[in-house]
């Protein structure tokens, strides 16, 4: 399932079909947020059922918002700058996603740090994709 979703994202050329890219990044981030929420609710049980539902929604929708902002920013940046395969587009998208997280938490420090870290991580992922880096190499038998 996961490789299919990631392939769906990478198969769309940067700077085109921004709505499909945003949908893909939103769905990936939503699953990540739902997973984090499941761990949070399991390891730190809420007092009531409604508190648990609220925490799951908070984690899931925050992650979905970060993913949507990332997808839209990278795509629009690639389209406006007319440089589709530039890691700077991904830095801008990661930074915008980090700023969204900071706005959600009402904390400038978290927003600034997340901007830098998400931007660097997204740029490295794009550089690795362009240069063919293998994160998990297949074993040679």
Curated annotation (Swiss-Prot):
It is found in: Mitochondrion inner membrane. Disulfide bonds: none annotated. The modification N-acetylalanine is found at residue 2. GO terms for biological process: mitochondrial electron transport, NADH to ubiquinone. The chain crosses the membrane at residues 21-43, 58-80. Keywords: Acetylation, Electron transport, Membrane, Mitochondrion, Mitochondrion inner membrane, Respiratory chain, Transmembrane, Transmembrane helix, Transport. InterPro entries: NDUFA11. Belongs to the complex I NDUFA11 subunit family. This is NADH dehydrogenase [ubiquinone] 1 alpha subcomplex subunit 11.
């Amino acid at each position: 399932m996961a490789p299919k979703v990631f392939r769906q994202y990478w198969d769309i050329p940067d700077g085109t079909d921004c709505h499909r890219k945003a949908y893909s990044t939103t769905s990936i981030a939503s699953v990540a947020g739902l997973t984090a929420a499941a761990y949070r609710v399991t390891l730190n049980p809420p007092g009531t059922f409604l508190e648990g539902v609220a925490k799951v929604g908070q984690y899931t929708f925050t992650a979905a918002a970060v993913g949507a902002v990332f997808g839209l920013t990278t795509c629009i940046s690639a389209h406006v700058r007319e440089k589709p395969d530039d890691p700077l587009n991904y830095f801008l998208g990661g930074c915008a996603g980090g700023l969204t997280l900071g706005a959600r938490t009402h904390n400038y420090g978290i927003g600034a740090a997340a901007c830098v870290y998400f931007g660097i991580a997204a740029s490295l992922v794009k550089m690795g994709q362009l240069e063919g880096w293998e994160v998990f190499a297949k074993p040679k038998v």
